[in-house]
């Protein structure tokens, strides 16, 4: 038994089969795993690897400095990754950035709750000082009971 598909149907089928294999940039946060997210670090090499990734390089050189609680760490030979950390610098998750565009990285960082300043030297509003983490809960009046 053979199944004949019209050209449009064949294209749709092909697109459906290829899409999952190419959708490496569609990172979806697992919020249960990211409980306690407080800061982030982008780890990448400073040279040749980054120079081949124009979009990632633009994010690293121009955008990181705009985000509160997000820093850059140069590691020789490292592929670019966003490392998500707890308040105690415990690693929660690593997200590869090599296949992402600058816009995708910015959207991801903002979705994760990092505050984007208007300029590198701009002040962070008080309500965002703990971003992306939630501020510590007020101590209960009954903690000593």
Curated annotation (Swiss-Prot):
A Pfam family that the UniProt record links to this protein: Sep15_SelM
Keywords: Cytoplasm, Endoplasmic reticulum, Golgi apparatus, Selenocysteine, Signal
Subcellular locations according to the entry: Cytoplasm, Perinuclear region; Endoplasmic reticulum; Golgi apparatus
Entry keyword Glycoprotein: no
GO cellular component terms, semicolon-separated: endoplasmic reticulum; Golgi apparatus; perinuclear region of cytoplasm
Top-rank taxon: Eukaryota
Tissue expression as described in the entry: Widely expressed. Highly expressed in brain.
GO BP, one annotated term: corticosterone secretion
Enzyme active site: 45, 48
Signal peptide: 1-23
Cysteinyl-selenocysteine (Cys-Sec) crosslink, residue number(s): 45-48
Main localization of the protein described in the UniProt heading: cytoplasm
Region of interest: Disordered: 125-145
Gene3D superfamilies, alphabetized: Sep15/SelM thioredoxin-like domain, active-site redox motif (3.40.30.50)
Database matches in SUPFAM superfamilies: Thioredoxin-like
Chain's role: May function as a thiol-disulfide oxidoreductase that participates in disulfide bond formation.
Similarity annotation: Belongs to the selenoprotein M/F family.
Protein name as it appears in the record: Selenoprotein M
Native source organism of the sequence: Mus musculus
């Amino acid at each position: 038994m053979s199944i004949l598909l019209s050209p449009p149907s064949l294209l749709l089928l092909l697109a459906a089969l290829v899409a999952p294999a190419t959708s490496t940039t569609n990172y979806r946060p697992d919020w249960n795993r990211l409980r306690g997210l407080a800061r982030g670090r982008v780890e990448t090499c400073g040279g040749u690897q980054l120079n081949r990734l124009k979009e990632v390089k633009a994010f690293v050189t121009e955008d990181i400095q705009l985000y509160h609680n997000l820093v850059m760490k140069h590691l020789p030979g490292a592929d670019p990754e966003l490392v998500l950390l707890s308040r105690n610098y415990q690693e929660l998750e690593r997200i590869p950035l090599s296949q992402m565009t600058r816009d995708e990285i910015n959207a991801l960082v903002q979705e994760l709750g990092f505050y984007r300043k208007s300029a590198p030297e701009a002040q962070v509003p008080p309500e965002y000082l703990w971003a992306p983490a939630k501020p510590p809960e007020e101590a209960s009046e009954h903690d000593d009971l």
